[in-house]
Amino acid sequence: MKLFYKPGACSLASHITLRESGKDFTLVSVDLMKKRLENGDDYFAVNPKGQVPALLLDDGTLLTEGVAIMQYLADSVPDRQLLAPVNSISRYKTIEWLNYIATELHKGFTPLFRPDTPEEYKPTVRAQLEKKLQYVNEALKDEHWICGQRFTIADAYLFTVLRWAYAVKLNLEGLEHIAAFMQRMAERPEVQDALSAEGLK
């Protein structure tokens, strides 16, 4: 299978999940500004949405949207326990976090990355994100991972988005549980491999 990605983008969560799954895959970098692949091909021909991630399965099926890709990968390797079984409350708590990260955190950063966002609007965006990160920090207070004592795909997504918080220099002072979580994630070999493959540190 092939993962279409942009270094450091939200596709990093799917990349980490792929490495945690133990599956064989190849990486294809996408220039999202030009919508071109490494070889110059039109990315819209692969994914009409023009966004990453996209996962091309061996049978030719294309999956898009990171949350869907991560759940598919987790369910394909149940022995890895990246997502709890159907009908377990643990599974739905993980999905709850995936949705929160996608809608409240991930999309919350978008105005900070868009060059056309008015400068006077950015302090409000930053303040909203910092308030939400306080909630995340509190959720990690007594837990090793965001859903408890076992690593899940929600951790891969949370790690990816939290990296942006550091990149745009949000005020993370006093959020020691987030800092500890980021350190635990950085120590995972699969995370290290994903970051290295994307040329990140």
Swiss-Prot record:
Entry annotated with the keyword Cytoplasm: yes
- SUPFAM superfamilies xref list: GST C-terminal domain-like, Thioredoxin-like
Sequence positions that bind glutathione: C10, K35, V52, E65, G66, N99, T103, E104, L105, H106
Q: Where in the cell is it found?
A: Cytoplasm
**Main location, first listed in the record:** cytoplasm
The disruption phenotype is: Deletion of the gstA gene decreases the resistance of the bacteria to hydrogen peroxide.
Give the UniProt record's GO annotations in the biological process aspect: response to hydrogen peroxide
GO CC terms: cytoplasm
Keyword Cytoplasm in the entry? The reply is yes
**Reaction catalysis annotation:** RX + glutathione = an S-substituted glutathione + a halide anion + H(+)
What InterPro entries does the annotation carry? Glutathione-S-Trfase_C-like, Glutathione-S-Trfase_C_sf, Glutathione_S-Trfase, Glutathione_S-Trfase_N, GST_C, Thioredoxin-like_sf
**Enzyme class, first EC level, given as a word:** transferase
Question: Sorted alphabetically, which CDD domains does this protein's record hold?
Answer: GST_C_Beta, GST_N_Beta
Instruction: Please list the residue ranges annotated as the GST C-terminal domain.
Output: 87-201
- Any one Pfam family match given in the protein's UniProt record, by short name: GST_C
Tell me its EC number(s), please. Answer: 2.5.1.18
Q: Name one GO molecular function term.
A: protein homodimerization activity
Instruction: Summarize what the entry records about the temperature dependence of activity.
Output: Optimum temperature is 35 degrees Celsius.
**Domain (GST N-terminal): residue spans on this chain:** 1-81
What functional role does this protein have? Catalyzes the conjugation of reduced glutathione (GSH) to a wide number of exogenous and endogenous hydrophobic electrophiles. Shows activity toward 1-chloro-2,4-dinitrobenzene (CDNB) and ethacrynic acid. Also possesses thiol:disulfide oxidoreductase activity, using GSH to reduce bis-(2-hydroxyethyl) disulfide (HEDS). Has a low level of glutathione-dependent peroxidase activity toward cumene hydroperoxide. Is important for defense against oxidative stress, probably via its peroxidase activity.
Subunit annotation: Homodimer.
What family does the Swiss-Prot or TrEMBL record give for this protein?
Belongs to the GST superfamily. Beta family.
This protein's name: Glutathione S-transferase GstA
| Organism whose genome encodes this protein | Escherichia coli (strain K12)
Q: Which gene is the coding source of this polypeptide chain? A: gstA
